[in-house]
């Protein structure tokens, strides 16, 4: 971990941006809404005391959030990152931006070189908007609506981890809408979908992460 003095030191650099990652770094979707707000507000208070401002950027712990929590974050931050893979473009929701993990497990140079060459697979919207899955909507009904300008959609492939097993997803294209049908319920804490398209100018990619409510 970094000390506050170290954070203040690097924060002075022109290309360094400090982000907020919550106070507890806990599984915040398990919190009731009041406890969630208290955690976020406490983190903001500490940042304001230590560096004089609350950062523009927030990163959801473990990439988990409900729609209610996302709406609260929108009143406190300008940008927020999930933990679903993908490439940022101008059409992405600025409160659920994608990010690829680069760490000791997923950080070899070959993978890094592949990731930095990826292009965004842009879309108008993804349903459902709420990424928190309950017993009532597991598996969720998922569709992705693309822009008319996106060509070669028949080349798209998706993989997902329902039933605790990564496999190729069953997909259906209706004009510019992609419908993803899951084989089973999501059994692990996080349900993931990764879609890629080998386009004329390179590989395009987007991902979705759901968090499965535990009762």
Q: What residue ranges belong to the model's regions?
A:
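Metal-dependent polysaccharide deacetylase catalytic core of the NodB/CE4 family, i.e.
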Residues: 1-68, 91-98
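Terminal accessory/targeting
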Residues: 1-2, 99-215
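Acidic, His- and aromatic-enriched active-site or binding-groove loops in soluble protein domains
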Residues: 3, 77-86
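Glycine-enriched alpha-helix->loop->beta-strand junction motifs that scaffold or abut catalytic
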Residues: 14-18, 74-80
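Active-site proximal loops enriched in glycine and acidic residues that flank catalytic Cys/His/Asp
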Residues: 62, 84-85, 146
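Extended amphipathic alpha-helical segments with heptad-repeat/coiled-coil character used for oligomerization
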Residues: 84, 95-98, 102
């Amino acid at each position: 971990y970094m000390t506050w003095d170290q954070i203040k030191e690097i924060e002075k650099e022109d290309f360094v941006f400090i982000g907020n990652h919550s106070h507890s770094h806990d599984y915040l979707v398990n919190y009731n809404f009041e406890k969630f707000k208290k955690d976020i507000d406490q983190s903001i208070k500490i940042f304001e005391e230590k560096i004089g401002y609350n950062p523009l950027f927030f990163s959801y712990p473990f990439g988990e959030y409900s729609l209610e929590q996302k709406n609260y974050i929108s009143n406190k931050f300008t940008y927020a990152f999930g933990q679903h893979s993908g490439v940022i473009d101008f059409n992405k929701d600025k409160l659920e931006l994608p990010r690829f993990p680069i760490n000791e497990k997923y950080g070899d140079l070959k993978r890094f070189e592949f990731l930095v060459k990826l292009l965004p697979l842009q879309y108008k919207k993804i349903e459902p908007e709420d990424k928190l899955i309950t017993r009532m909507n597991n598996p969720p009904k998922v569709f992705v609506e693309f822009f008319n300008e996106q060509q070669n959609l028949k080349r798209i492939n998706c993989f997902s981890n329902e039933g605790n097993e990564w496999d190729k997803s069953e997909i259906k294209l209706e004009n510019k809408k992609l419908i993803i049908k899951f084989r089973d319920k999501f059994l692990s804490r996080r349900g993931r979908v990764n879609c890629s398209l080998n386009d004329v100018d390179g590989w395009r990619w987007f991902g979705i992460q759901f968090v499965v409510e535990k009762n």
